[in-house]
């Protein structure tokens, strides 16, 4: 109830000229008059309206200048709509940023807030680029994709799941194909359903997989040959991850409540870490050979220094159900997903939740989680992909998969569908996300 008056006081105290907040406030009141362009500048009323005579040149059907203004107007209108939709969220973002700097005359934090404004309005929609199918039998509904990962150069991506197959596709070929009939460059058959895959960041073509029998397998993805197998887990293995610093090191987590550390140079595990409950996911800090995060069925995220595994460095508490995924946004921030239908943002130096993300539905399945460092993508049990910006709690974009039905199910309503988005992967250095659902449909999507 007191957020808006406090926000107004901050605006009056700290800003004597047109500022980020004034533009934001004016946009909400009169979206035709102002808009944020770049860092704290404004677009005047006469320039924002392409129909204004002073901004148009004579000529058949308007000029190039007029066309550019029309395009600019439509773009800004889209951004205005998103700012208005997330206005309360932006207030909270502003307050949390500014209150960290208690000096009355300080302008610290404004740059971060400006960057948040710019980044969260960067994309307005999701555009499909290509469609693939993981299913071996189009009549078989059990073709859940459990994991999608790009290789170290973002040239190839692998898809794995319950059909026991790992399919490797060349990204450039998939995008360039005119028709949506795509063939993998290689295909590997496993002995059990696959839960997770991870590419080596050093050896081109080296891929690790974990499966429902508890086996961790190292593959040469281009020859399709098994390089090594590790079989120490006693139950289903949910997650596997290559270390980006020590490129011979691999971690795996299992229902046997153990995290195993492997070296591709050794035949047996080099470290065995005992957890308090089933381990659903493991992820190395991308800048460290020693630091590992794991998500557990006891609702917690644990952060370990592998040089001393007796106690975790930090335990992140806040989820109400099992933690299914953990991903690092950067070297200090990580995001977790849980079957409590929430994502949570954490900082390794602080034990409390930085932000919760709500909007998607996730109560029982692994639905995928990916990030490019600023945006977070996750699946949902309503057969949709959700995109969040790390500075805001509500989703900024959503893409719904089509429901494919057989003859017996054609009269079912879409909301009665049991399909869910099951795997998500970000193509790093780009705005491309690859997502798959429980029917085995894979979409290559671009944020625009």
List each model region and its residues:
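WD40/WD-repeat beta-propeller blade-loop signature
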Residues: 144, 153, 184, 193, ...
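Beta-propeller domains
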Residues: 104-137, 157-187, 222
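Structured C-terminal portions of repeat-based eukaryotic scaffold domains
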Residues: 307-436, 443-448
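Conserved strand-to-loop turn within each blade of WD40 beta-propeller repeats
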Residues: 160-163, 209-213, 252-256, 264, ...
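WD40-repeat beta-propellers
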Residues: 166-172, 197, 216-220, 240, ...
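Intrinsically disordered terminal extensions that flank WD40 beta-propeller domains
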Residues: 1-142
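WD40/WD-repeat beta-propeller blade N-cap
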Residues: 135-143, 187-194, 231-237, 273-279, ...
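Loop/turn segments within WD40 beta-propeller blades
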Residues: 149-154, 197-204, 210, 223, ...
